Curated annotation (Swiss-Prot):
This is ATP phosphoribosyltransferase. CDD domains: PBP2_HisGs. Lacks the C-terminal regulatory region which is replaced by HisZ. Catalyzes the condensation of ATP and 5-phosphoribose 1-diphosphate to form N'-(5'-phosphoribosyl)-ATP (PR-ATP). Has a crucial role in the pathway because the rate of histidine biosynthesis seems to be controlled primarily by regulation of HisG enzymatic activity. It is found in: Cytoplasm. PANTHER family: ATP PHOSPHORIBOSYLTRANSFERASE (PTHR21403:SF8), ATP PHOSPHORIBOSYLTRANSFERASE ATP-PRTASE (PTHR21403). It holds the Pfam family HisG. GO terms for molecular function: ATP binding; ATP phosphoribosyltransferase activity. It comes from the Bacteria. Its EC number is 2.4.2.17.
Length: 216
C-alpha cells in the first residue's frame, strides 16, 4: 500500500490542485473526470489519490483513511475539525460566501424591523453563527442544491451560498447584499499522520507551500 493517500474531489478543486501535485513530482495515472476509478495511482509508488465528495474530504482525513486532502474553507467550517491540521491556504477555488435575496426584496428594511427571516443554505452552521453575531433571528432551511430557487418560490426570504461571478444570481433575478467571508481551498493533514509519517509528509507541505501564488 502507498505511504501517502491524498483525498481530493472532482471538478474545480482537483483541476486547481494539479499544479501543486506537479510541483511535488506527482502525476495522476488517470483523469478522474473520465475514469470511474475512485482510487487513482500516480507516477510515484508511494502516493495515491482517493476521489470523494467535496463534503467528505475532511472526514476521510480526520479518520485516517487519507493522510492529506484539499477542501474548501466552506466545507471545513461545517466540519468539526477534530484531528485536522490546516497548514496552508492554497488560494485556489476562490469565491465569496454571500447572503443573497430577490432583486425586489427590501432586506435592509426587514432587518431594521427585526423580522424573523427564513434563510435557505447548505452552510447551516456558518449561517447560524453569522446571523447570531448580528443579533438576527432566522429560521434556517437546509438545502443541498439549487439555492437560487428558494426565494423565487417563497421557500425562503434569503439564501447563503457561494458566489463566484454572480452570473447565476443575476440570471435568477437575485442580488448579493452581504458578504460573510472569502472562501478558498485549504490543504488539510491528519494530525496523527503528520507525526507518524512526517518524513514523507513534510516535503509535500514544503513543495505545496512554495507553489502557492504569492500575488493573491
Amino acid at each position: 500500500m502507498p505511504d501517502i493517500t491524498i483525498a481530493l474531489s472532482k471538478g474545480r478543486i482537483f483541476e486547481d490542485t494539479i499544479p501543486f501535485l506537479k510541483a511535488a513530482g506527482i502525476v495522476p495515472s488517470d483523469d478522474p473526470d473520465t475514469s470511474r476509478k475512485l482510487i487513482i495511482g500516480t507516477n510515484r509508488p508511494d502516493v495515491r489519490l482517493v476521489m470523494v465528495r467535496a463534503t467528505d474530504v475532511p472526514t476521510y482525513v480526520q479518520y485516517g483513511a487519507a493522510d492529506l486532502g484539499v477542501a474548501g474553507k466552506d466545507v471545513l467550517l461545517e466540519h468539526d475539525g477534530i484531528g485536522l491540521y490546516q497548514p496552508l491556504d492554497l488560494k485556489i477555488a476562490r469565491c465569496r460566501m454571500m447572503v443573497a435575496v430577490r432583486d425586489d426584496y427590501d432586506y435592509a428594511s426587514a432587518v431594521f424591523r427585526g423580522a424573523r427571516l427564513r434563510v435557505a443554505t447548505k452552510y447551516v452552521k456558518t449561517a447560524r453563527n453569522h446571523f447570531a453575531a448580528k443579533g438576527m433571528h432566522v429560521d434556517l432551511i437546509k438545502l443541498y442544491g439549487s439555492m437560487e430557487l428558494a426565494p423565487l418560490v417563497d421557500l425562503a426570504d434569503a439564501i447563503v451560498d457561494l458566489v463566484s461571478t454572480g452570473s447565476t444570481l443575476k440570471a435568477n433575478h437575485l442580488q448579493a447584499i452581504e458578504e460573510i467571508m472569502p472562501i478558498s481551498a485549504r490543504l488539510i493533514v491528519n494530525q496523527a499522520a503528520l507525526k507518524l509519517k512526517n518524513t514523507a509528509i513534510q516535503p509535500l507541505l514544503e513543495t505545496f507551500s512554495a507553489a502557492v501564488p504569492k500575488n493573491l
